[in-house]
Amino acid sequence: MTNIRKSHPLAKIINESFIDLPTPSNISAWWNFGSLLGVCLIIQILTGLFLAMHYTSDTMTAFSSVTHICRDVNYGWIIRYMHANGASMFFICLFMHVGRGVYYGSYAFTETWNIGILLMYTVMATAFMGYVLPWGQMSFWGATVITNLLSAIPYIGTNLVEWIWGGFSVDKATLTRFFAFHFILPFIISTLAAVHLLFLHETGSNNPSGVMSDSDKIPFHPYYTIKDILGLLLLILVLMLLVLFSPDLLGDPDNYIPANPLNTPPHIKPEWYFLFAYAILRSIPNKLGGVLALVLSILILAIIPLLHTSKQRSMMFRPLSQCLFWLLVADLLTLTWIGGQPVEHPFITIGQLASILYFSIFLILMPVSGIIENRLLKW
């Protein structure tokens, strides 16, 4: 008799994806972040659902409804802070996951990689709209500044901004539609994640050495299910430490002031996970140029497979490229720091230099280092 997990139509899909899936035997802890992203998504959907039961998307009551959740709803405070800090954990896992892909050459699976870039944009859009919902000062001014960037688009810009706002400024219509989009987008993300997995399972996972591993594969369960559970426990530990000991560590104090269109905060800045892109945006004096640089800061990931010049897929045995990769990490940390600083000397210059370096690493230095390493192989 055939095992039910191998014969039942639904169980068969789960079996082929999570149980009998042939997996390279040498994948490291860097491959844990995919499953952790799935866990983060589930946490966000569940906590978000419970928050939506008590939240009201009206400019007059949005701020009060969030306060009500924290003060009066049973365990509302923990749900709210798990959702807010869960977003930070989501982005930490996302950056680690993308970084792993760049380091080990996972971008060679172009379909999986491009769906991943689309996922990243969608997650960023969802997080941005979620930040607007509490209707604090930074929510309001963040929404105003970021949506206003679309006015840089020639000819249709102004009309587009007013269309998104639903009026002549960020107001009730904007908040209501942002709530609607923020609610529906995680389900779209879930669908895209399923497509992402579908494409990945067509080719099989990459591994640290970057070479074909068909001759040496092991079943996903129990080896990697156990490994993923360890990652999950560590993720929940860090999240709960954050939620229970310093829930406002990554937030902005200005967001505890109700939105006031007549009073601009001294420093308008987004959440920490957008600061690198925000720094790139601010480093260009021209508005349209800044918006293009902002979009390209993520879209440049799509160009990486086209600029791969090395004969080796992974950076595991490529010391020059490794140095460039860690330079990129340091550069991103610098950009994140600059994004949170006021627009004044010397931060402007540092931001411009870091932005130039960011694009140079991807477009010039990495392809050149690949060519040099190919030459070194012949020595």
UniProtKB/Swiss-Prot annotation:
One BP annotation, GO: mitochondrial electron transport, ubiquinol to cytochrome c
One Pfam short name: Cytochrom_B_C
Keywords: Electron transport, Heme, Iron, Membrane, Metal-binding, Mitochondrion, Mitochondrion inner membrane, Respiratory chain, Transmembrane, Transmembrane helix, Transport, Ubiquinone
Cofactor needs: heme b
Parts of the chain that traverse the membrane: 33-53, 77-98, 113-133, 178-198, 226-246, 288-308, 320-340, 347-367
Cofactor mode of binding and number, as noted: Binds 2 heme b groups non-covalently.
Entry keyword Thylakoid: no
Binding, heme b b562: H83, H182
Chief location of this protein within or outside the cell: mitochondrion
InterPro entries in the record: Cyt_b/b6_C, Cyt_b/b6_C_sf, Cyt_b/b6_N, Cytb/b6-like_sf, Cytochrome_b, Cytochrome_b_C_euk/bac, Cytochrome_b_N_euk/bac, Di-haem_cyt_TM
Binding-site positions, heme b b566: H97, H196
PROSITE patterns found in the cross-reference section: CYTB_CTER, CYTB_NTER
Any coiled-coil regions, as ranges: none
Keyword Iron: yes
CDD domains, sorted: cytochrome_b_C, Cytochrome_b_N
Family affiliation: Belongs to the cytochrome b family.
Note: Heme 1 (or BL or b562) is low-potential and absorbs at about 562 nm, and heme 2 (or BH or b566) is high-potential and absorbs at about 566 nm.
Function: Component of the ubiquinol-cytochrome c reductase complex (complex III or cytochrome b-c1 complex) that is part of the mitochondrial respiratory chain. The b-c1 complex mediates electron transfer from ubiquinol to cytochrome c. Contributes to the generation of a proton gradient across the mitochondrial membrane that is then used for ATP synthesis.
Quaternary state and interactors: The cytochrome bc1 complex contains 11 subunits: 3 respiratory subunits (MT-CYB, CYC1 and UQCRFS1), 2 core proteins (UQCRC1 and UQCRC2) and 6 low-molecular weight proteins (UQCRH/QCR6, UQCRB/QCR7, UQCRQ/QCR8, UQCR10/QCR9, UQCR11/QCR10 and a cleavage product of UQCRFS1). This cytochrome bc1 complex then forms a dimer.
The name this protein goes by in its record: Cytochrome b
UniProt source species: Genetta genetta (Small-spotted genet)
Gene behind the chain: MT-CYB
